[in-house]
Design a protein with these regions (language model features):
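Charged, often Cys/His-bearing segments associated with DNA-binding zinc-finger transcription factors
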Residues: 1-48, 282-283
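Short amphipathic alpha-helical segments enriched in hydrophobics
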Residues: 32-43, 70, 98, 246, ...
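Arg/Lys-rich, glycine/proline-spaced intrinsically disordered segments
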Residues: 48-50, 221
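Short, charged/polar micro-motifs that form catalytic or ligand-binding hotspots
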Residues: 52, 66, 77
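Short, amphipathic alpha-helical "recognition" segments used to contact nucleic acids or chromatin
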Residues: 55-69
Length: 285
């Protein structure tokens, strides 16, 4: 049964495979190779135990299916004729190995200050993922903008290459600018950074930053200011496209049901997978 499943998926075109699992075949093969290399390094002759029911190729498919569709472990388990606890272990193990391989890691905020690779223009934005109502400290996660409990992810990307440089996650209640201050992200003086109106006041931290002009209670925007905001929005729109590409994985767009402490790991991993597709010249559509 599993062999026929793998064969069926391999017969899909590249576009069909992406629609099914959220990544292209080339990215999938790189993920499989990364997991195999980590497993080969960790295995020793003294280790004993039952053989896994799924091959590494199948385990990666299960993980991609979980991220892409975000069905429960039980429902995915019935598709693969496995228990939900086995599916849970497969997903967690695969995520851990992908990170350990080093092939799916972001550059990190230090790259923003690295003289050799500083980006010319960066775009920064915060996206939110709804979560189930917490049993304790609900106020910490309630987003006034959304009207429900959320987790926030701050993304910093290179405008030219569309590569995500770093990610920082926080609770839904905090303001976008507060999340920026907690993240301790700093830009090189020569880097131009573009943000939305949620980052008013960022000029105190980086003078080469641009945010939209806001109208006040007693003053409307001039035509020149409106044109400025329109031009800035065109430059900043790339970060919205990146958010959309990440959220084809329903684990980031649907209500997040898992432990919150694992959310940041998954956002970073999916961001690195997105970067991987850019790097091999097959940017997610």
């Amino acid at each position: 049964m599993f062999i026929s499943k793998i064969m069926d998926y391999q017969n899909l075109s590249d576009e069909q495979f992406k629609r099914r699992f959220g990544v292209y075949k080339q990215t999938y093969r790189k993920m499989v190779e990364s997991v195999k290399s980590v497993e080969a390094d960790s295995n020793s002759p003294s280790k004993r135990g039952p053989k896994p029911k799924l091959s590494i190729e199948e385990q990666v498919l299960v993980t991609l299916e979980y991220w892409r569709e975000y069905r429960t472990y039980f429902h995915i388990g019935t598709s693969w004729e496995l228990s939900e606890s086995t599916i849970c272990r497969i997903v967690n193990k695969t995520e851990k190995m992908l990170l350990q391989s080093g092939n799916f890691r972001l550059k990190g905020k230090k790259a923003l200050l690295n003289q050799a690779e500083i980006p010319v223009i960066t775009v920064m934005d915060v996206t939110e993922t709804p979560i189930e109502r917490p049993q304790k400290k609900q106020k910490d996660f309630f987003s006034g903008k959304r009207g429900y409990n959320t987790l926030k992810s701050q993304l910093v990307a290179d405008q030219k290459t569309e590569e995500i440089i770093c990610v920082f996650c926080g609770k839904g209640r905090g303001h976008d600018f507060s999340l920026f201050k907690k993240s301790r992200v700093r830009f090189h003086p020569l880097t131009t950074s573009i943000e939305d109106s949620g980052y008013q006041g960022i000029a105190a931290y980086h003078s080469n930053s641009y945010t939209p002009k806001k109208k006040s209670k007693n003053r409307k925007l001039t035509e020149l200011e409106k044109e400025y905001n329109k031009a800035l929005a065109k430059e900043r729109i790339i970060i919205e496209h990146i958010n959309r590409k990440l959220k084809i994985f329903k684990i980031l767009s649907c209500k997040y049901r898992n432990r919150r402490r694992r959310y940041s790991l998954r956002v970073n991993l999916l961001a690195a997978i997105y970067n991987c597709e850019l790097g091999i010249g097959i940017a997610a559509s």
